[in-house]
């Protein structure tokens, strides 16, 4: 059974504090939007899908007990709070897309004269709650498409049928499992599906400095699931791909541009470069909500920069020389030219096919 990072019932939201893992498993109550903003900004919850879900559910928790004098007042409240939540971690596009969708719903309901303010609030709460189930279903589809893509490529290289390929070794970066989503995971969902098919020989996870999401969170999930797994340092990836016959790299995404350029956790870009050099397929696993067709390329993606302390300290212990300057971008952008395929809940697309394919899917 996968870990549960988000616990929700109407009027109540608790999140697993990921800053305390793996030493302590503690749930933190999110009582409203201010709490939601803080747990997202402080990275007590992280992962683009989970950020969107927790952000929107924090708004649902806040408005649930409130009574509004009019639909217009409710709509104003929704708009202001959603805009505030988007500012917590601006690189992750899922929160912005979810906010836009919920605001569009609020606008439509405000104009609908057949619905009163109580009905509008109920419809809004239902829409936010539906995000949980949809995210899990989308992740399971991503896992299935991704596993089949990796196995197909391995089989083709060996001149065999897809069903006879494997077991395979894969590498992942950062944390993209149940802790980063509502459940199952994106890139780690691909790993999970390979394991369920009996096709996972081994999974390697990077430590993912400076926040150590791989060492703290992915390793925690892999041990929990009892998958055959090994933790490696970020600086070991080239040696790993040269020595260990890795069949594919699969990572998540915080934002994918229309041309396929992908913003993901810092260190992803260099892994893609190394994978290209060694001829190892490099896949990005992301729901459609992580794809931003309004951004033409990676140069237009805003990259969040984090505090120096995340580099200079581990817990309360300083590990860097006092007085040294730091540069701490949370993400980097992997060029589309280094990406083999982008795995979504609707299939796997080459970066150059992405814009046209996603546009057609959204129009259908």
UniProtKB/Swiss-Prot annotation:
Its EC number is 5.3.1.23. Signal peptide: none annotated. Pfam families: IF-2B (PF01008). It is an enzyme of class 5 (isomerase). The record marks 174 as: Transition state stabilizer. One of its GO terms (biological process) is L-methionine salvage from methylthioadenosine. It catalyses: 5-(methylsulfanyl)-alpha-D-ribose 1-phosphate = 5-(methylsulfanyl)-D-ribulose 1-phosphate. GO terms for cellular component: cytoplasm; nucleus. Gene3D superfamilies: translation initiation factor eif-2b, domain 1, Translation initiation factor eif-2b, domain 2. One of its GO terms (molecular function) is S-methyl-5-thioribose-1-phosphate isomerase activity. It is found in: Cytoplasm; Nucleus. The active site is at residue 254. Pathway: Amino-acid biosynthesis; L-methionine biosynthesis via salvage pathway; L-methionine from S-methyl-5-thio-alpha-D-ribose 1-phosphate: step 1/6. Keywords: Amino-acid biosynthesis, Cytoplasm, Isomerase, Methionine biosynthesis, Nucleus. Belongs to the eIF-2B alpha/beta/delta subunits family. MtnA subfamily. Catalyzes the interconversion of methylthioribose-1-phosphate (MTR-1-P) into methylthioribulose-1-phosphate (MTRu-1-P). PANTHER family: METHYLTHIORIBOSE-1-PHOSPHATE ISOMERASE. This is Methylthioribose-1-phosphate isomerase.
